[in-house]
């Protein structure tokens, strides 16, 4: 699957056409009020481009929350999003109370030129995800012919299809892969994601550094193995470093995280790194705690001293930070996925914050820096560095699967150039 050869919105003829666009309006809500409109704001350039280039209408579809295939308009309706969209676009948005069916098809058949239409939550229908559960908790499964009907109805709502929902690209849901139109393009958000991941995965400048943090080795095996085929350098930190250090250095790790499953493949990983000539940097010192608590008593340890029984490592220490700074300074391309410590708590945030500062510095000197979604993106928001790195991915699961070398169904479904 080539990321850089997919049809993009700027190459799509939208004049006089109805554009059906899959967006990600899965925004946080409190009592039907949107608490963060970032995802809605992010979709505006793609919507505006269609309108400015003479599209007859833009029909928007999205999911919100996890209604599991059951209509829950009181809890998960997209209606509040229509109001927010209206204020951001400065024009009326027609909200429809469903996303498929005869009424919706009629409303979208011949809309007034320049219309913006928002459909109700896709996941009110079990046919979107293929499975769900009813209010009693019983599992429900969509019937194949109903899935086909659902997809056929969505396909009637537009003449061309645009997908701007990278965060859901790793899911083979109906709205991601089932709209049957001849031209299927990525929107500008999706395009930016694909452009940056193509830079890392298809044609990397070197030296290329991957920084991998997070808790469990087992969760990151596929990621580590795939990246070892691509990179020159790797930093392994976070909770999973303790498993490596215990296996490789026989380090005493006290009550730190230890991953039994992951421990079995540590030696394989090191053999592969050696074979590929990849240098892996591990932490050499640690900030420790006497319990997993924000206000725990804080101590310090090194690989040589070990971590005493009952204590746990929750961050890397100053020597590790110096080592990381040296490795980062040499790189021309960096992909970072996973924090180096419990960054949510100030006492254990220094390692991740020090690394972030070095990444920002490297970016200002021309290094390409890509932050995988999820917790690492949260770090960027916390320290206000989103515009000080090259790219912060909007998709945690989707970016992880790309870096693992998997094919994303939502990207594969797009037309090739």
Swiss-Prot record:
Protein residues bound to Mg(2+): 215, 218-219, 375
**Enzyme class at the top of the EC tree:** transferase
Pfam families reported in the protein's UniProt record: PGK
Which parts of the sequence carry N6-acetyllysine?
11, 48, 75, 86, 97, 131, 146, 199, 267, 291
Phosphoserine is found on 2, 4
For the ligand (CDP), the binding residues are 214, 219, 238, 338, 343
Keywords, sorted A to Z: Acetylation, ATP-binding, Cytoplasm, Glycolysis, Kinase, Magnesium, Metal-binding, Nucleotide-binding, Phosphoprotein, Transferase
One Gene Ontology CC term in the entry: cytosol
The source's superkingdom equals Eukaryota
| Protein residues bound to (2R)-3-phosphoglycerate | 23-26, 38-39, 62-63, 65-66, 122-123, 170-171
Main location as per UniProt: cytoplasm
Protein family according to the UniProt entry? Belongs to the phosphoglycerate kinase family.
What is the annotated role of this protein in its UniProt record? Essential for sperm motility and male fertility but is not required for the completion of spermatogenesis.
Tell me the subunit arrangement: Monomer.
Name by which UniProt lists this protein:
Phosphoglycerate kinase 2
Q: Native species of this protein?
A: Macaca fascicularis
